[in-house]
Amino acid sequence: MTESSFKLAIVVSQFNRAVTEKLLNGVLQRLTELDVQANQIKTVWVPGAVEIPLLAKRLAKSKHYQAIVCLGAVIRGETDHYNYVCQQVSYGCQQVALEYEVPIIFGVLTTTTKEQAFARAGGERGNKGADWADAAVSMIKLMKEIEITDE
């Protein structure tokens, strides 16, 4: 399977956009390095992290994409909201992957501080977006290798 034979989608949260734009740039830069063309990629923006699973489900249901990369940045605040958001988004993404058998790459940073988020979005810890792009391409290849045919 060549890199040019698939399509993937990227769902990006607008909340904490300064971080998520950097993550998106990391994904796109790595995909370019892997010779994935712009016409193979669809990027959609959602208001916040909680909305990611619904759009991921819609994209998976369309059967147009062989993987979906979900990007967000949830940064702990003073309330329990952080815990609920992190749990809902991770569970929702996993459910979509299992229901539609489409790799859903969980690219949602869950950090205690903004500094930690920026460190993982192109800062001293690198750009996790590149890792998630690699994971998407790897999973597309694995799913193709282990393709199940209807009998």
Swiss-Prot record:
One GO MF term attached to the UniProt entry: 6,7-dimethyl-8-ribityllumazine synthase activity
Keywords tagged on the record: Riboflavin biosynthesis, Transferase
Reactions mediated catalytically: (2S)-2-hydroxy-3-oxobutyl phosphate + 5-amino-6-(D-ribitylamino)uracil = 6,7-dimethyl-8-(1-D-ribityl)lumazine + phosphate + 2 H2O + H(+)
InterPro entries in UniProt: LS, LS/RS, LS/RS_sf
Active-site residue numbers: 81
Pfam family name, one: DMRL_synthase
Enzyme class: transferase
GO biological process entries: riboflavin biosynthetic process
Enzyme Commission code(s) on record: 2.5.1.78
Binding locations of 5-amino-6-(D-ribitylamino)uracil: 15, 49-51, 73-75, 106
Residues where (2S)-2-hydroxy-3-oxobutyl phosphate binds: 78-79, 120
Pathway per the UniProt entry: Cofactor biosynthesis; riboflavin biosynthesis; riboflavin from 2-hydroxy-3-oxobutyl phosphate and 5-amino-6-(D-ribitylamino)uracil: step 1/2
Similarity-based family: Belongs to the DMRL synthase family.
PANTHER family, per the entry: 6,7-DIMETHYL-8-RIBITYLLUMAZINE SYNTHASE, 6,7-DIMETHYL-8-RIBITYLLUMAZINE SYNTHASE DMRL SYNTHASE LUMAZINE SYNTHASE
UniProt cross-references to NCBIfam families, sorted A to Z: lumazine-synth
HAMAP family in UniProt: Lumazine_synth
Function of the molecule: Catalyzes the formation of 6,7-dimethyl-8-ribityllumazine by condensation of 5-amino-6-(D-ribitylamino)uracil with 3,4-dihydroxy-2-butanone 4-phosphate. This is the penultimate step in the biosynthesis of riboflavin.
Protein name: 6,7-dimethyl-8-ribityllumazine synthase
Organism this protein belongs to: Coxiella burnetii (strain CbuK_Q154)
